[in-house]
Every structure is written in structure tokens, then in C-alpha cells.
Design a protein with these regions (language model features):
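Iron-sulfur-associated redox domains of electron-transfer enzymes in respiratory
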Residues: 1-139
Length: 139
């Protein structure tokens, strides 16, 4: 099994993640010696359609410490860099403790948790059909 990459978002501009949680997660990542990538703000990167999002989305399995899984999914999709649903686990620094997040980040187990549905090339939301052999409706 491939070791998941770790991505840490500092949520610098939105300032919606508790500072104590961000600081504790970052400190534990730095102290661990585990390789990780840190970005200032995924929201800002998405708004600029930063090419780094493509590299991050296409690099294999990834665990992301940021905010809500649905928000992270759509930030990447808005930049035309969709995350692989089966290879992405998002840890929510808005609702989870630093201990919960770092335990999950350091665990070799992947728990993919992106919500169902995907973005189409024209920006429409596509709902994945739960009925086999049935087309998915577009919104």
C-alpha cells in the first residue's frame, strides 16, 4: 500500500479554523519528522486556479488537514483539479481536535470521505446514480 501524502492548509485568509487547532496540528507535523506539504490557503489557491492544485490532486493518495470535506472537494474542482474520491481523506480542523487530526494523519489507514457527486467540465453538479445502469441526473 502506498503511504498517503499529507497536505496541511493554514487557512490564512479565511480565518475560520481555530488558531489553537491549526498551531497544534502544524507543530505536531513538524515534530514528527514525517514529510508533509503546507499551503497558506486552499481557498486562495482555488480562486487563482493555482497549478499546484493539479499536482496535489494527481499525486496519488492524500490526507488533507483543512476544513470541511465538501469545501475542500469543491475548492479543487473549481480549479479544474478534482481530487480522487477513493484516495482522499480530509480532516476537518474546524470540528475535530488536533489530537484526532494528527492521529488520523499519522495512521497508515486511509478513510476516504469526499461526499458523493462530481463536478462536470461545464461546472454543473452531477449526482452519481445509486441505481445501477441508470444515467446520473445533472443539476
Amino acid at each position: 500500500m502506498t503511504t498517503p501524502r499529507i497536505l496541511y492548509c493554514n487557512c490564512t485568509y479565511a480565518q475560520v479554523v481555530p488558531k489553537e487547532v491549526k498551531a497544534a496540528v502544524l507543530r505536531k507535523l513538524c515534530e514528527s519528522g514525517v514529510e508533509f506539504e503546507a499551503v497558506a490557503d486552499l481557498c486562495e489557491m482555488s480562486a487563482r486556479k493555482d497549478a499546484a492544485l493539479h499536482r496535489l490532486a494527481e499525486g496519488g493518495v492524500v490526507k488533507i488537514a483543512a476544513c470541511y470535506p465538501r469545501a475542500v472537494k469543491w475548492l479543487f474542482a473549481a480549479a479544474n483539479a478534482p481530487l480522487p474520491p477513493a484516495g482522499t481523506e480530509v480532516l476537518n480542523m474546524r470540528t475535530q481536535t488536533a489530537d484526532e487530526i494528527t492521529k488520523a494523519l499519522f495512521s497508515p489507514e486511509m478513510k476516504p470521505n469526499l461526499p458523493a457527486g462530481k463536478a462536470s467540465h461545464n461546472g454543473a453538479v452531477v449526482i452519481e446514480s445509486a441505481i445501477p445502469n441508470q444515467p446520473s441526473p445533472s443539476l
